[in-house]
Amino acid sequence: MDSYVIQTNVNDSLPSVLDVRVNIGGRSSVQGRAKGRKARWNVRPSDMSNKTFNPIRAIVDNMKVKPNPNKTVISLSIGDPTVFGNLPTDPEVTQAMKDALDSGKYNGYAPSIGYLSSREEVASYYHCPEAPLEAKDVILTSGCSQAIELCLAVLANPGQNILIPRPGFSLYRTLAESMGIEVKLYNLLPEKSWEIDLKQLESLIDEKTACLVVNNPSNPCGSVFSKRHLQKILAVAERQCVPILADEIYGDMVFSDCKYEPMATLSTNVPILSCGGLAKRWLVPGWRLGWILIHDRRDIFGNEIRDGLVKLSQRILGPCTIVQGALKSILQRTPQEFYQDTLSFLKSNADLCYGALSAIPGLQPVRPSGAMYLMVGIEMEHFPEFENDVEFTERLIAEQSVHCLPATCFEYPNFFRVVITVPEVMMLEACSRIQEFCEQHYHCAEGSQEECDK
């Protein structure tokens, strides 16, 4: 039997040269001399970690400003509905979790894409004649964020590009660029309730475009696209043969004066990966259960995209099994009154905030129709001491102890985002402080003195 022997000088602890001797057919010969590795510590971060950049963290962490010690801090910046304790999930939801835990059935590993029974429940919950679903069309994930990550990873290669909204959720860029995927920004129009500039969107598409990301209802805008507008978006995607990643984590979280339309119900020709989860509608973001719904009635994705999602899901071996065990009861037993009460509160707060901020000179809020947010334009010409929205919001913290996210975090300068999940009394106080702040810093723009005198 042939043998391979590497001979070293045992007297040298760190040899610089190795003799490689090969014994073939009983004959020994020196095949070559290999250079050894000079041992030294050289641990460096990976390219992926160096490419990973979260605009919100980069901006907020550099806002080294202390709030006014004489005023209680009011945070309108955190998109977590549980922070203030005024929006608990329904008792049926927590009981479902307790029952799943007490059963002892869900302490082990599940398939990486989730239990079959849990995927069947999600498919049944979202199935409709216009967009039929089966368990094989559902991938369970660790929150909606991981659902988005898997969709980007399965659709795009390094060097390709994706189209994302401006303003838009910063995670899209963070994930894409860490994978070497280029990001192209399409514009949302505040004067049209944040509808997409469709002409500009289509101009961005080229042979390297891997997918179009559509977030509806929107974070940070609180906008909800009409059926007609969604059909126009789908027409662009169909014309250009670009699949859609639909971020629908706020699906059904729309106010009573408008209707939510899942994108997949409006097209049989465009393949759509819809991302959702429990976080927002059920008010449990920390439970980290999301899903991908695969809508592909023309079999454009074929088996390859489905298989790719399964393979990618195996990197973390699936989401929390206890939440999966509770999923059937959560989806079947949560009363409609819970959803209605949540939306009633959000709409009331949105109306209150919009009305109060609309009356403040220098601010231009855009009325929301759903989700948990409201965007406010700053007429910077009336606040000349501030260079941009970041400085404006920094001073708002320092003087009034009110935290709002500058919309530069969402690629949209000279706006700021307000979270409308805070208790009503806190919202009233925050709006009052914002008014006081603006009145103290407002200056008439050149040529508008007559308006200021009114």
From Swiss-Prot:
Its cofactor is pyridoxal 5'-phosphate. The modification Phosphoserine is found at residue 448. Pathway: Amino-acid degradation; L-phenylalanine degradation; acetoacetate and fumarate from L-phenylalanine: step 2/6. The modification N6-(pyridoxal phosphate)lysine is found at residue 280. Optimum temperature is 55-70 degrees Celsius. It catalyses: L-tyrosine + 2-oxoglutarate = 3-(4-hydroxyphenyl)pyruvate + L-glutamate. InterPro entries: Aminotransferase_I/II_large, NHTrfase_class1_PyrdxlP-BS, PyrdxlP-dep_Trfase, PyrdxlP-dep_Trfase_major, PyrdxlP-dep_Trfase_small, Tyr_aminoTrfase_ubiquitination, TyrNic_aminoTrfase, Tyrosine_aminoTrfase. The modification N-acetylmethionine is found at residue 1. Optimum pH is 7. Keywords: Acetylation, Aminotransferase, Phenylalanine catabolism, Phosphoprotein, Pyridoxal phosphate, Transferase, Tyrosine catabolism. Transmembrane segments: none annotated. Its EC number is 2.6.1.5. GO terms for cellular component: mitochondrion. GO terms for molecular function: amino acid binding; identical protein binding; L-tyrosine-2-oxoglutarate transaminase activity; pyridoxal phosphate binding. Transaminase involved in tyrosine breakdown. Converts tyrosine to p-hydroxyphenylpyruvate. Can catalyze the reverse reaction, using glutamic acid, with 2-oxoglutarate as cosubstrate (in vitro). Has much lower affinity and transaminase activity for phenylalanine. Homodimer. PANTHER family: TYROSINE AMINOTRANSFERASE (PTHR45744:SF2). Belongs to the class-I pyridoxal-phosphate-dependent aminotransferase family. This is Tyrosine aminotransferase. The lineage of its organism: Eukaryota, Metazoa, Chordata, Craniata, Vertebrata. The gene is Tat.
